[in-house]
Design a protein with these regions (language model features):
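A short beta-strand-loop structural module common to alpha/beta enzyme folds
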Residues: 38-44
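Acidic, His- and aromatic-enriched active-site or binding-groove loops in soluble protein domains
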Residues: 59-70, 174-199, 351
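Hydrophobic alpha-helical transmembrane segments in multi-pass integral membrane proteins
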Residues: 74-79
């Protein structure tokens, strides 16, 4: 007989898990809608040409693709491209700014990891048509309120502005393509710093940590050897990765971020970046902390028209953010985000209890993206939650109530009362309660045992009580039983 198994990198959700997810989903929807965002839905697959419009053919390696009717399609890896398609096609007969939200599955073709699946869910918002710093602040606020409403406390919010790096590189004469490449390197440096800090905080290094460091050491060895062979740099000193490095993994956990910095610095200089510019980029990437400390430090360090404008924008966004009541944040100038379409404000929400996959949300301003998809120049800002990680984060927080599955189970002393059970259950459903009746012929003890697993209350029907127009209401948490008039049952349930 053929054995069937779950596709790699996917998940089944049993009733209790699905109840948790639906509960969080409703919180997400209500929070988004409270800020005026309206839900949209797009196909789970798009023409591959659309999905590759910005990233090029190389995106194919990380996607599920197929051909139908002579057209190549791809399962969507994210939702923003579809939103841009909707805008560019001119079918939106509504005033700006557009305020959309979406919740749905996305797909990536890569090796599955812990908390990183091939099918995953995103919940996000897009605010299109406003260049105001207040729009950035509102988008960030929606993220903060969503996590708080979902019971995810203890998150870390990092806010920066990628325009600072773009301004430094622009003043040095580098075009957008070179900027994107170097900013991508900075993003890699930042993520390595975070990862190695997590590893250092552990009492014992895990197998996946060793694998991570080995992978980076092998990559650094190849990069450094190429630079040395080309005569770009003769040595990297204590940060030079030798073949013996793989035998000294624990020692490299602390040195790896600096080694990566030195290697990228050498590459940048080889590509024409002035030494002082390379050093400035790395110095800026290390600046982070409270607004009162970071902004004066940044304004003293950074000069240049483009850079100063980005700092002013960041300061204004933070002012609006505090007006929204969001004060628990860090200003981190090194937040670069891995995607090259960001143009200004960038931000991330981390939940440390998730470990290596701690980021639950990320986003920022992308004023040129709609234009790059063929539309008119349109300012925009937005973000996406990793919905699965939000649910997981919520479950890691203590004292979070589990959403109930059923409000009430109708139990009967014997089968002669089944019709009455149906009548009562229907009346309760019409009043908005989730009600279930006995379907398997169990005795009363069996029914109550089942009810305790799936419901908050049990309503027990007995011939004697029904003659008096009453039923027995049992609180399945406290075990307390109370006689209640049938006509007052819904009031007693609260």
């Amino acid at each position: 007989m053929v054995e069937f198994s779950l596709p790699r990198g996917t998940m089944d959700f049993l009733p209790e898990e699905k109840a948790q997810r639906r509960y969080v989903e409703e919180i997400v929807r209500k929070t988004f809608e409270s800020f005026g965002f309206q839900e949209i839905e797009t196909p789970i697959f798009e023409e591959f040409a659309l999905l590759a419009a910005r990233s090029g053919e190389e995106i194919r390696e990380g996607m599920f693709t197929f051909v139908a009717d002579g057209v190549e399609y791809g399962l969507r890896p994210e939702m923003t491209a579809a939103v841009c398609r909707m805008i560019v096609t001119g079918k939106l007969n509504m005033p700006k700014p557009y305020k959309f939200y979406y919740i749905g599955p996305c797909f990536r073709y890569e090796e599955p990891q812990a908390s990183r699946y091939r099918q995953f869910w995103q919940a996000g918002i897009e605010l299109v048509g406003s260049s105001s710093p207040a729009a950035d602040a509102e988008v960030i606020t929606v993220g903060a309120k969503t996590l708080e409403n979902a019971g995810v406390t203890g998150y870390i919010l990092k806010v920066g502005n990628i325009g600072i790096f773009r301004g430094i590189l622009e003043d040095a004469g580098f075009d957008t393509e070179d900027q994107n490449r170097i900013i991508g390197n900075i993003d890699s440096i930042m993520s390595t710093r975070d990862k190695c800090q997590l590893i250092a905080e552990k009492a014992k290094m895990e197998v996946e940590d060793e694998s991570y460091i080995k992978t980076y050491l092998s990559m650094l060895y190849d990069m450094q050897m190429q630079l040395i062979s080309q005569g770009v740099q003769s040595s990297f000193g204590e940060y030079e990765v030798l073949p013996s490095a793989l035998e000294k993994i624990p020692q490299w956990a602390e040195k790896l971020p600096k080694a990566l910095e030195e290697t990228y610095r050498a590459i940048w200089i080889a590509d024409g970046v002035p030494e002082e510019t390379a050093d400035l980029l790395l110095r800026v990437s290390r600046i982070g902390g409270p607004r009162s400390e970071v902004m004066p430090q940044a304004k003293e360090l950074l000069t240049g028209t483009a850079v100063e404008k980005s700092l002013e924008d960041l300061d204004e966004v933070l002012t609006y953010l505090e007006a929204f009541g969001v004060t628990n944040y860090e200003v981190v100038l090194g937040v670069a985000r891995g995607l090259d379409f960001y143009t200004g404000t960038v931000f991330e929400f981390d939940f440390p209890l998730l470990g290596a996959q701690k980021q639950v949300c990320g986003g920022g301003r992308y004023d040129k993206l709609v234009e790059e998809f063929g539309g008119q120049s349109t300012p925009a800002t937005g973000y996406a939650f990793g919905f699965d990680r939000v649910v997981q984060s919520r479950q890691l927080v203590k004292d979070i109530p589990v959403p109930g599955k059923v409000d009430v189970f109708i139990a009967t002393v014997d089968g002669s009362l089944d019709r009455k059970a149906i009548e009562i259950s229907q009346n309760l459903r019409e009043k908005g309660y989730k009600a279930e009746i006995e379907m398997t012929g169990r005795d009363l003890k069996g029914q109550l045992g089942y009810a305790s697993e799936i419901a908050r209350y049990a309503v027990i029907l007995g011939p004697k009580e029904l003659k008096e127009g009453k039923v027995m209401l049992k609180n399945l948490k406290t075990e307390e039983q109370t006689p209640v008039l049938v006509d007052e049952l819904s009031d007693a349930l609260g």
